[in-house]
Amino acid sequence: MEDYNNQMDHESSGGRGNFLYASPNLGGNYGRAASDHQMGINTFHLQSSGGGGGGGSGDQCNFQSPGTHPINVKTEATTSQHGHQKFQYNNNNNSHLVSSSRGHQPVIHQLQNNFDLLNDDHSLSSNEVEAIKAKIIAHPQYSNLLEAYMDCQRVGAPSDVVARLSVARQEFEARQRSSGTSRETSKDPELDQFMEAYYDMLVKYREELTRPIQEAMDFMRRIETQLNMLGNNNNAPPLRIFSPSEDKCEGIGSSEEEQENSGGETEVPEIDPRAEDRELKNHLLRKYSGYLSSLKQELSKKKKKGKLPKDARQKLLSWWELHYKWPYPSESEKVALAESTGLDQKQINNWFINQRKRHWKPSEDMQFMVMDGLHPQNAALYMDGHYIGDGHYRLGP
């Protein structure tokens, strides 16, 4: 929250403002004497100030409602030249300013637990201050205003802080019921406008606080899901970035009424993104397992196509080089080659067929022999460097 306040301070210095409420008669003179200076425009914003109850010109009064703790309120004196009025709320060691000024960009900051809507002034007597304070506490909008403020405090707060805020709210309501304070319809339009504007400002402030925190938590949950999906391959235990208490957003955007209507917070069960895929896979395996098994066996029986053994190829190439002019082995030669290479005759036939297609072209003499009707395999004698019969005897060159 401190980082967020620092960021908002930086933005305000750059001329950026949030939640501007302007009205000629919106709370500018509320609780002040008729002789005070009129302001042309009133803007309400929260501005961080440095600690304590604050000094400066002005008096400090203590207001206390029946059954409540004292409330410190301070007004800083201003002049008509500045047109500037500040409502300062003090609580513990921190102080925040609700400013009503002209020409200054509004900046939203965290409110304190016991915020006030009045300022002391030299022109107001103690009786008048008590009367104004009683009007604010008795205003019908005061309960909603307090609830909106506590919702802002819940945003991003740890679970123990959220619990303390809920207890404080319940104690306040109990004191209000025991004191018998009635909240009749307000007859002060100026006070109505001030309470309504302040309530709207707190609601918008809560929305601005909730949005970045919710987006950050959604992003971390997506990262958590992706990491768990990657870890499922290694059977790793589920990864949780948020603890169970943090996973409930620590009171983000939740009021006491919302928690009561929901019957308490319940942890959303984790959804395995791969459960549906695994279920489909198991169903297909059960349905087609028999067919897949038979297909696997059939494929395993088939020999993969590959090259012949190196030694066998070398012996076939040696025979090829010796019989290049007529590379047609006889049946007896095929049997001999099969025995020497360890191949069957089908493999030998296929090898010679492919080898002749790729690397052999008949000579002109062989082409004439084929054209004359002399089958080469039946030729008992072929001169010009070829073999006689089975090729064991060779004639002269």
Swiss-Prot record:
GO CC terms, sorted: nucleus
Bias (Gly residues): 49-58
PANTHER family referenced in this protein's UniProt entry, alphabetically: HOMEOBOX PROTEIN TRANSCRIPTION FACTORS (PTHR11850)
Residue span(s) of domain ELK: 279-299
An example molecular function term from Gene Ontology annotations: DNA binding
Organism of this sequence: Malus domestica (Apple)
Compartments (UniProt record): Nucleus
UniProt-recorded name of the protein: Homeobox protein knotted-1-like 2
Keyword DNA-binding tagged: yes
Keywords assigned by UniProt, alphabetized: DNA-binding, Homeobox, Nucleus
Region of interest called Disordered, as start-end residue ranges on this chain: 43-68, 172-191, 233-276
Coiled-coil portions: none
